[in-house]
Amino acid sequence: MTRQLSFPASRVAVVSITRHGITLAGRVIAALPGARLFVPEKFRAEADAAAAGAVSCYAGKTGDQIPALFASFDGIVCIVSLGAVVRLIAPHLKNKEADPGIVVIDEAGRFVIPMLSGHLGGANALAGCLAEALGATPVLTTASDARQTLAVDLLGRELGWTFEASHDEIVRASAAMVNDEPVALVQEAGGGDWWTRHANGRSGPLPVNLKQFARLEEIDPEAFSAILWVSRRELPAGWAAKLAGKRVIYRPPQDAA
């Protein structure tokens, strides 16, 4: 597997509720060493054959297992119909910052669908890894991934960057990117080839609506719908007001260029 997960494989739960689905689940577990397979007790023998040593069986309803799975895992792979998964998880959803990444795979293993927390929760990255391992088609519906543009909430993640922004600022900057509005990218630190490694990999030139700068002081904030600032310094005096509501600040680790 060449793609990178957003969390350790040991933080992934795989859920399957049918005999044929459990066979596929064995392949998923093989692709994610350390992941755990959850199945109904009646399929214990099939599960042990498919993923020996990685099986947890439960009695009762699958829906009753969801709270514990949400609390214990960062990623949940469901080999269950998409509609059924919607009904199972709906009562337990909080917000995109807290919910785990959830991926759905059809029983034939043809399609891998990140259905919840694609970016912050890592579902898109998990889906990409599994699609590659299974020879399946990843079905990405997030606008930035469908259009292969910049995902504001993932910029620099592969390089260890963190970001500082409110929920509304992320929404505004993300909307500006996917709607082709002018966006400034000011990179004062971090280095690295972040574009080809971005969000499981991008190819070709940068988005045409993204204009690059080397220093924050070079930009006219009024000319841009959003400003993405990669730096280790604090905002210069007076700039907080100029960038209010439309800036995302990225902080590369100290040992980066």
For each predicted feature, which ranges?
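An N-terminal, well-structured beta->alpha segment
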Residues: 2-6
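Extreme N-terminal starter segment of soluble prokaryotic enzymes
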Residues: 8-14
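Conserved mixed alpha/beta catalytic, RNA-binding, or beta-rich assembly cores of soluble enzyme
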Residues: 15-34, 39-45, 56-60, 75, ...
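Extracellular lectin-like interaction modules
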Residues: 46-50
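Short, structured active-site "lid" loops
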Residues: 53-83
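Conserved mixed alpha/beta core segments that line enzyme active sites in large multi-domain catalysts
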Residues: 65-68, 169-173, 217
